[in-house]
A protein has these predicted regions:
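Residue-level signal for the short linker/turn that defines the boundary of a DNA-recognition helix
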Residues: 6, 16-17, 43-46
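The alpha-helix within a helix-turn-helix
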Residues: 12, 23, 52
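Short, charged recognition helix plus adjacent turn
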Residues: 14, 53, 63-77
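Short alpha-helical DNA-recognition segment
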Residues: 16-35
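DNA major-groove recognition helix of helix-turn-helix
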Residues: 37, 47, 66
Length: 77
């Protein structure tokens, strides 16, 4: 949980986003997002997916499974 909290806040600030901007990008209420960053609330799978897309990273990076910030390349359709 600590890994996700730290990475969420660091990436958000690195991108120059406020919690209000994250609300607009993800649909997660600002107060709920704040609690997630403080470790008082967990991200659902769908919320994690939306946050990763908004921050242009992978869910694996947020979870601490990789140190590669770049998202995985999308498959060609």
């Amino acid at each position: 949980m600590v890994m996700i909290m730290n990475r969420l806040q660091a990436l958000r600030k690195e991108r120059g986003f406020t919690q209000i901007k994250m609300q607009m990008l993800t649909g997660i209420d600002q107060s709920a997002y704040s609690k997630i960053e403080r470790g008082e609330r967990y991200l659902s799978f769908e919320q994690c997916r939306r946050v990763a897309l908004a921050l242009n990273t992978s869910m694996d990076y947020l979870a601490g499974l990789t140190d590669e910030k770049a998202p995985y390349p999308r498959a060609k359709q």
